Structure formats: structure tokens, C-alpha cells
Regions:
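Cell wall/extracellular polymer interaction/catalysis modules
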Residues: 1-121, 126
Length: 126
């Protein structure tokens, strides 16, 4: 099970840390709570691979996000790169992520490994 622990929020972005059990994987970037496409609510969500037109391949989507659809985990560096999705990378510079594509590839491999081992994978957002 993946766990996303949010550690900082302001009016421009939300920063978190993503874990596999208790093992730190990466940092995350989401929009703030009070915008047109806010970060998702705290809760546990099943992850399913679905085709993404934006990325041209199957991507990890979060299911049953309180009526919202299209919420996925994907690479990106800045708040403008997300419309409610969870971006992954390294939070080295305030308000942004770096090394996002390589980090996504690592996280994606972990999600696929969990899915292959357990038949399902969830993420708990706190």
C-alpha cells in the first residue's frame, strides 16, 4: 500500500511525501485545496491503469475520488502541471519538483510490482 503524507500547503501548492509502507519513495506536488482543480480529499483510493491521451500510454489513475475522474499519478514540475493530479519528483526548490520523469518511472515500476504481487494497489492520502 502506498501512503501520501501531505507536509505543507499554501494558496499555490501542496507538498507531500510518498511512501511504500514505511519506505520513502519521493516527494509529491498537488494543487492547493481552494482552486478550480483542488487536491483530492484525504482517503484511500484504488489505483488502476487506464489509457491516457495526454501521455499516450497506460497511466496509474486513482478511482472513486469523490466524484472526480481523471486523477492520476504522473510526472510534472510545477503547480501549473497539475489539475488535481499527484505529481512525483524531488522537492529541492521551493514550490516545485525536479527529476520528475525518472522519479515517475521508479514509482510506476513499484506500483506495477505491487499490482502484480497483490492483484491490486491502493494509495492512502493523509
Amino acid at each position: 500500500m502506498l501512503v501520501l503524507k501531505r507536509i505543507f500547503q499554501n494558496d499555490k501548492y501542496t507538498i507531500g511525501r510518498l511512501y511504500d509502507s514505511n519506505t520513502y519513495l519521493c516527494d509529491t506536488l498537488e494543487p492547493p485545496k481552494h482552486v478550480n482543480h483542488p487536491c483530492i480529499d484525504n482517503g484511500t483510493y484504488k489505483i488502476s491503469y487506464q489509457p491516457s491521451k495526454k501521455f499516450g500510454r497506460n497511466m496509474p489513475f486513482l478511482l472513486n475520488c469523490n466524484g472526480r475522474v481523471g486523477i492520476m499519478i504522473h510526472p510534472g514540475n510545477y503547480p501549473r502541471d497539475t489539475q488535481g493530479c499527484i505529481l512525483v519528483g524531488r522537492n529541492i526548490t521551493k514550490g516545485s519538483l525536479s527529476h520528475s520523469k525518472g522519479t515517475f518511472d521508479n514509482v510506476n515500476a513499484i506500483i506495477q510490482a505491487i499490482l502484480n504481487l497483490n492483484g491490486s494497489v491502493t494509495i492512502t492520502v493523509q
